[in-house]
């Protein structure tokens, strides 16, 4: 499976990475392993569809993680 990070989440991490899939892997577990606080997440997409941290990932999935975006 693949994990893509966007904007500030890339700082000190990566842009795109192949992730070793394991049975029962969730979006929330990947957030934990990357030390990304769920409160800082704006959008989570799996295969271009909105998802939640408890979503169980599949072997060929692509997870995209976007931070909250502020401005004004």
Predicted regions and their residues:
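Ubiquitin-like/PB1-type beta-grasp interaction modules and other compact soluble beta-rich domains
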Residues: 1-71
């Amino acid at each position: 499976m693949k994990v893509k990070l966007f904007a500030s989440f890339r700082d000190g991490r990566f842009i795109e990475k192949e992730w070793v899939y394991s049975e029962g892997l969730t979006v929330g577990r990947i957030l934990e392993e990357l030390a990304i606080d769920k409160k800082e997440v704006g959008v989570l997409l799996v295969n271009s569809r909105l998802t939640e941290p408890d979503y169980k990932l599949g072997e060929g999935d692509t997870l995209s993680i976007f931070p909250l975006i502020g401005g004004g």
